[in-house]
Amino acid sequence: MSENYTPRLKTRYRSEIRETLNKEFEYANVMQIPGVTKVVVNMGVGDAARDSKLINGALNDLTLITGQKPQIRRAKKAIANFKLREGMPIGARVTLRGDRMWEFLDRLLTVALPRIRDFRGLSDKQFDGHGNYTFGLSEQSMFYELDVDKIDRPRGMNITVVTSATNNEEGRALLRELGFPFKK
C-alpha cells in the first residue's frame, strides 16, 4: 500500500458517519463519538486435538482472509473426556487494527456477507452491553480470497467488532451506519 492511501470505509467514517452519529446522540465532545477499535477473528479447531495437521489449514485460511499471520491458541488445561492435553493447539486468532481492520470490514460487508446463501441479515441482539458486536460464520467459502477448490473442510469463525461505544444503542448505530446488514 502506498503512503497516502486511506481505506474507503475509514474515509466514509471520518467524513460522513461521525457527523451523523454526533447529530443523533448530541455528544458534548467529538472524542466521545464511537469508532471501531479492533476486529478479532477467531477460528476454533477442536478436531486439531486428534489430528495436529488440521490447525495448518485453519492458519492458512485465516492468513488469506485477513492478510495477517494468526496466533495459535492452545488449551489452557487438560480435559480427558475430549482427549485434550494442556498446550495442544485448538484454535487460531487474528486481531486486526488500523488500516487492515478497515479493509477487512469493507471486504466483509461488501463482498463476503452478500455471498452467503439465504442470507437475511445479522441479528442485532448480539451486543455485549458495551457496544461490542460478535457474530459467527458457519463456513469460510464466502471470502473470495480463498480458492473454493483448495478448501479442505468447512470451518466456521467468530468475528468480534470492538467499538469505543459506551452502550448497545451507540454501537448498533455505528455499525448500521458502517453498513452492517442487521435484520429489521
UniProtKB/Swiss-Prot annotation:
GO terms for cellular component: ribonucleoprotein complex; ribosome. It comes from the Bacteria. GO terms for molecular function: rRNA binding; structural constituent of ribosome; tRNA binding. Gene3D superfamilies: 3.30.1440.10. InterPro entries: Ribosomal_uL5 (IPR002132), Ribosomal_uL5_bac-type (IPR020930), Ribosomal_uL5_C (IPR031309), Ribosomal_uL5_dom_sf (IPR022803), Ribosomal_uL5_N (IPR031310). Keywords: Ribonucleoprotein, Ribosomal protein, RNA-binding, rRNA-binding, tRNA-binding. GO terms for biological process: translation. This is one of the proteins that bind and probably mediate the attachment of the 5S RNA into the large ribosomal subunit, where it forms part of the central protuberance. In the 70S ribosome it contacts protein S13 of the 30S subunit (bridge B1b), connecting the 2 subunits; this bridge is implicated in subunit movement. Contacts the P site tRNA; the 5S rRNA and some of its associated proteins might help stabilize positioning of ribosome-bound tRNAs. PANTHER family: 60S RIBOSOMAL PROTEIN L11-RELATED. Part of the 50S ribosomal subunit; part of the 5S rRNA/L5/L18/L25 subcomplex. Contacts the 5S rRNA and the P site tRNA. Forms a bridge to the 30S subunit in the 70S ribosome. Belongs to the universal ribosomal protein uL5 family. This is Large ribosomal subunit protein uL5. It comes from Corynebacterium kroppenstedtii (strain DSM 44385 / JCM 11950 / CIP 105744 / CCUG 35717). The gene is rplE.
